[in-house]
Structures are given as C-alpha cells and as structure tokens.
C-alpha cells in the first residue's frame, strides 16, 4: 500500500515538472513570436508611403528600361515565375505621391549599418489607379502570397513556405489589404510598396533582383511604373546605389 503511494507521489512530481517545462517553453515561444511580429510591424510602418495627391500638373515622360540594363548580373538566373518585359513608355504626374521617412536614405551615410531596408514602389501612372482584380492575379503570378500583417510576402518557396525574402504592402496607410471575393473587383489603390530587409536569407543580391523583377512584372500587368524609395523613376544609376548599399551592409556584417 505504501509502495503504491510512493509511486503515485513520484508520478505527481514528474507531472508537475513536465507542466512547468511545458509552460516555460510556451512562454519563450510566445515571446519570440511577439518580438518578431513587433519588429516586422515597425519596419513595415516605417517604410509604407502615405499618398498625398498633388495639384501639380507637370508631367514627366517615363521610359522603362530592359531588365538586363537595370540589374547586370548574368550569373543569376531570372525567376521562372516572371516573364521578360519589353521596353515601354508612360506618362506620370510628378510629385503626385509622398512618403514618410524614406528620403532619409539618400542623405544619411551608411556608417557600417548592420541592417537596412530597401524599398521599391509600383505606382499607377497618369493619375490612374491599380485595379484589384489585375493586381491580385499579378501578385500571385509573381509568387507573392497573402499572409502575416494582411500584406503579401514572397517566401523562399513561391508556394508560401520558407523564410520571407521580401514583402509588399498597400501604398495607402495603414498599408494592409482588404481583399475578398466581394470587393476585389472594386478595389483600387494608387500603388503598392515593396520592401526587403538586408541582410536577408540566402543571396541578398539575388533576392533584390527577384523583388525588382516582381515590381516590373506588376507594373507591366497593372499599368504602372516602378519607382525608387523617393517615388522617382527607377534608373540604372539608382540601381547601382541599391547594389552598393547591399554590398556595404554585407561587408559590415562580415567584418564583425
């Protein structure tokens, strides 16, 4: 009888220990997930642009450039999900969109940062908008999946698994999308903002190239134009600046 009690006491002690360990593991996991969500939300909010339509009537002729001209790195294959684009020309109103805190990148020296965020925009041209149905189809074609924070993400695996390589948010604050079967046909936006964190999983240059290709493909499909973080036309010179930033950050992280 006493032996049976001892067994029950041992079982009880083991049960308590297991429950305590389970609680500690759950608490650690919850804190980790919460930290990741907060960090991602901070980055997203910092680099989502705010639309402020201007009365400025001056138009700028925008000439798109071939992919190979924008990003020269022939040893990296293009994403098979994306088709090649042809050169095209659009007219967009100048200064028709403004963004928060993004212009700081141009004037603040890098000073060996350990992390930066690269931003591209796809904006509708000539005072028009991007329409929900064509935008939705284009996002899926480029491998972007609707997910965390109610925005789109390009994962390592285009089916939606693996680490996030870059993300896409609505250009209108607060940045999320409200897509559903009822409103997708009527949904419109002046543009979308794409961003990626450097360092990133895998090859940062390749991941940036994927983001650039996705931006160009969305612009082609939806009738838009690819802009830099300051809402200026994306040029080969600006692409060189982006690539230099990537090299600088990767070098800074290697040196530590």
UniProtKB/Swiss-Prot annotation:
Residues 1-6 are periplasmic. Coiled coil: none annotated. It is a single-pass type I membrane protein. Its main location: membrane. Essential cell division protein that stabilizes the FtsZ protofilaments by cross-linking them and that serves as a cytoplasmic membrane anchor for the Z ring. Also required for the recruitment to the septal ring of downstream cell division proteins. Belongs to the ZipA family. This is Cell division protein ZipA. It comes from Baumannia cicadellinicola subsp. Homalodisca coagulata. The gene is zipA.
């Amino acid at each position: 009888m006493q032996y049976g009690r001892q067994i029950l006491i041992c079982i009880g002690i083991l049960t308590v220990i297991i429950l305590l360990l389970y609680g500690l593991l759950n608490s650690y996991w919850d804190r980790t997930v919460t930290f990741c969500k907060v960090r991602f939300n901070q980055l997203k909010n910092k680099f989502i642009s705010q639309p402020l339509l201007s009365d400025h009537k001056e138009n700028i002729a925008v000439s798109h450039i071939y992919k190979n001209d924008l990003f020269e790195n022939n040893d990296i294959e293009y994403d098979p999900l994306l088709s090649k684009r042809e050169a095209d020309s659009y007219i967009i109103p100048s200064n028709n969109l403004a963004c928060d805190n993004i212009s700081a990148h141009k004037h603040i020296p890098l000073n060996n940062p350990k992390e930066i965020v690269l931003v591209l925009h796809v904006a509708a041209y000539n005072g028009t908008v991007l329409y929900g149905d064509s935008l939705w189809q284009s996002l899926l074609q480029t491998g972007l999946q609707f997910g965390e924070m109610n925005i789109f993400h390009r994962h390592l695996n285009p089916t939606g698994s693996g680490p996030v390589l870059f993300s896409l948010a609505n250009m209108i604050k607060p940045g999320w999308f409200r897509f559903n079967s009822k409103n997708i046909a009527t949904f419109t936006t002046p543009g979308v903002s794409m961003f990626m964190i450097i360092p990133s999983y895998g090859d940062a240059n390749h991941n940036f190239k994927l983001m650039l290709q996705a931006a160009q493909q969305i612009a082609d499909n939806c009738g838009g134009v690819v802009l830099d973080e300051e809402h200026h036309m994306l040029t080969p010179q600006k692409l060189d600046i982006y690539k230099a930033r990537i090299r600088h950050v990767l070098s800074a992280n290697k040196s530590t």
